[in-house]
Amino acid sequence: MKMLADTEREEALNLQIEFEWVLRQEVHAILKQLRSILVECAHRFPVPLYENEGKKTEKFILTVSPDQLKAVLTLTGDAITQADISFKLCKAPSQTQRTSITHDSPWKLQQVQDAANHLQTAINHIDDVDDSYHFKTSDEVLHVIGNILDALQRGRNSLLVPKKKPIDELIKGRNMKSLVPNLPEDLAVSFYLQSHKLIIAVYQLLNNQGTMRFDSRQAEASVQWLNDVLLLLMNGQKLCQQLKDKISVFSVYKDFTVGSRSPSALSY
């Protein structure tokens, strides 16, 4: 029985030593590695963020055949600064509707700025931890990691899950005023990001014997920087989760804190 008790004490002591090393060394090393990943992610954004080049300009062609919908556009930063849009109406398939976006009234993609803001928040949570700070409990680390994970998830969701708006809200939306010429009141255009794609959707309200419904069609194009950003955000989340899982093992031992070893054990 005494040998068993001695073995248990030795195992507990070794676990305590590893716990202290993780808190004092490994947590800071992982936070530093994580910050490097997130700053690299920030540099991929087309808006000013962590000394990147700022407003990058790219051209895209979004089309669905046979000539049902086509948009030739310029994306500058988080806004569509120029676009030529043409599409066929479902109630008059031989008729082509045309409109455009000009530099004077750009179409803002709020998802880009939202994702950038959440990324900035995640980096700020890391910067709030001084390099010389000594974590004393697992709860401290889990609190910091939880805040970072929350910000990263919000950032990814901003790009993966576009906010859906009712068609009447789209028709009356601020961005619709960017179109020249303005579209008839039964038509709406929407630009949004979903995963690594830039998507244009056109909606038309239809009155079918007194019942209102809408017809829609969409076209898309792949955006390389979106793919890079989502991959780096995912890598950051994985690193956070690995640290969280490791710390959670120690959090089972509620009496584990830095300095809780007996004086005789401090020579280990």
UniProtKB/Swiss-Prot annotation:
Keyword Nucleus in annotation: yes
Keyword presence, Acetylation: no
Known role: Plays a role in promoting sleep by enhancing metabotropic transmission of the inhibitory neurotransmitter gamma-aminobutyric acid (GABA) in GABAergic neurons upstream of a wake-inducing dopaminergic pathway.
Species: Drosophila melanogaster
Underlying gene: rogdi
Keyword line: Cell projection, Cytoplasmic vesicle, Nucleus, Synapse
Tissue specificity comment: Expressed in both anterior and posterior regions of the brain including in GABAergic neurons.
Protein name according to UniProt: Protein rogdi
Protein's cellular compartments: Nucleus envelope; Presynapse; Cell projection, Axon; Perikaryon
Family annotation (InterPro entries): RAVE2/Rogdi
